[in-house]
Amino acid sequence: MTSDRLARAYLEKAAVRIRALKFLHQEGGYSDVVREAQECVEILLKGVLRCLGIEAPKIHDVSRLLRQRIDLLPKPLKDNLDEVSRISRELRKDRELAFYGADDWIPTEEYSDQDSLEAIRKAERVFEIVSPIIQ
């Protein structure tokens, strides 16, 4: 496994985004928190793939690919892969709705303080698990 400059840049971007999530939450931008938390998790997992020498596909949830390459994963990620995969899938499901909404789904009305706090918790958890791998 290697670390590369782009993967480390992804880690730095994720750290900034996590701080931004807290600001967005304080401002009541709950749907924005959900959307940005998904992007944070996505970039973290793509950073791990880079460290493993795997080209990240242009999709938003790479948890299946991580499972397919479980033999290459470092122990901390392997031990937490179920949790990381669940977080990635859950946030991915909300990605577009949190940003664009729909005629019957207004993001600023649908996402709550609790949804926002949960999204922050998920992003922080993935950061905690994968940051030692990328550094």
What are these regions (language model features)?
Residues M1-Q135:
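Terminal alpha-helical segments
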